[in-house]
């Protein structure tokens, strides 16, 4: 029994996991964003509320807007509005001039009469800043320039010099030699860097982002959209059905177990009663037999006295 209770408790804890699925809606800061929510009016027109956070068990928490099925009867701010036809079941929420703080969970609750009949849908809103754009720029390239080495050479010259002036025979001329000096300029190359400034256009949040590297060369990158999440109402009903089936199975198991235990107890009691009755019958038979023998002796004594 304890193991069954632990199993059922674990199952009930796992049930909310199937309900916590929600659809992601994206928006851009400064632009209006619409969170879709519709219901079928075949069963009648009913009230609807929008709130922040996950859908509670009843009503809406942090109510943003409320309708009576035909028009808006309450709104917490002028930025919240329902632009669809409310009487036809279109109760999509539009947030004007969205800001970054609008990101988070939103609950659309359509109140349908009956137990657990409300249509609850939870959405995750992601508001991101607009991506700035810049005009396309054409890359420029400068070819490297090369200079040839330049060599400057000087010829040696002999300059006659005399150390002193005298009347004597002049001494041999002294010469001064200049060695040539060679200066070489090595070639150097200058290369200009090529800069490319790709430009981006703002994403329209429908899965397409356009990127351009040149004014004449554009290509489009497709971003896959996230698959829509499963319907939380169906998950809730499936979880409740599984829980009800397990509870029914548990109840039937308890009833069968009690029936078997009671049958065993009744069988043991009948056996004890039969044993007791049998022992009492044997005791009664043993008591009656000596009394019969006493009666015989009394009759014989009386017959002898008569003689």
From Swiss-Prot:
SUPFAM superfamilies: Immunoglobulin. Coiled coil: none annotated. GO terms for cellular component: apical plasma membrane; brush border; cell surface; extracellular space; motile cilium; phagocytic vesicle. It is a single-pass type I membrane protein. InterPro entries: Ig-like_dom, Ig-like_dom_sf, Ig-like_fold, Ig_sub, Ig_V-set, TIM_domain-containing_protein. Residues 22-235 are extracellular. Glycans are attached at residue 206. GO terms for biological process: phagocytosis, engulfment; positive regulation of mast cell activation; response to lipopolysaccharide; response to mycotoxin; response to nutrient; response to testosterone; response to wounding; response to xenobiotic stimulus. Belongs to the immunoglobulin superfamily. TIM family. This is Hepatitis A virus cellular receptor 1 homolog. It comes from Rattus norvegicus. The lineage of its organism: Eukaryota, Metazoa, Chordata, Craniata, Vertebrata. The gene is Havcr1.
């Amino acid at each position: 029994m304890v193991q069954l209770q632990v199993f059922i408790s674990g199952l009930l804890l796992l049930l909310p996991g199937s309900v916590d699925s929600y659809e992601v809606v994206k928006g851009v800061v400064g632009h209006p964003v619409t969170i879709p929510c519709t219901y079928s009016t075949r069963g009648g027109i009913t009230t609807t509320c929008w709130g922040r956070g996950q859908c509670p068990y009843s009503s809406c928490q942090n109510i943003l807007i409320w309708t009576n099925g035909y028009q808006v009867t309450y709104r917490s701010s002028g930025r919240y509005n329902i632009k669809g036809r409310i009487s036809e079941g279109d109760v999509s929420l539009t947030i004007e001039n969205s800001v970054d703080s609008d990101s988070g969970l939103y609950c659309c609750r359509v109140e349908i009469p009956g137990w657990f009949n409300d249509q609850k849908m939870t959405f995750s809103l992601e508001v991101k800043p607009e991506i700035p754009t810049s005009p396309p720029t054409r890359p420029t390239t400068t070819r490297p320039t090369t200079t040839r080495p330049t060599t400057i050479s000087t010829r040696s010259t002999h300059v006659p010099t005399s150390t002193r002036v005298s009347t004597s025979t002049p001494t041999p001329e002294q010469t001064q030699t200049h060695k040539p000096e060679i200066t070489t300029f090595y070639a150097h190359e200058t290369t200009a860097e090529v800069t490319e400034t790709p430009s981006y256009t703002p994403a329209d949040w429908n899965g397409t982002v356009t990127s351009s590297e040149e004014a004449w060369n554009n290509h489009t990158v497709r971003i896959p959209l996230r698959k829509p999440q499963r319907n939380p109402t169906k998950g809730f009903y499936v979880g409740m059905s599984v829980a009800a089936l397990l509870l029914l199975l548990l109840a039937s198991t308890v009833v069968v177990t009690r029936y078997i235990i009671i049958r065993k107890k009744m069988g043991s009691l009948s056996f004890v009663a039969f044993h007791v009755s049998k022992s009492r019958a044997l005791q009664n038979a043993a008591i009656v037999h000596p009394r019969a023998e006493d009666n015989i002796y009394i009759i014989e004594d009386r017959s002898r006295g008569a003689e």
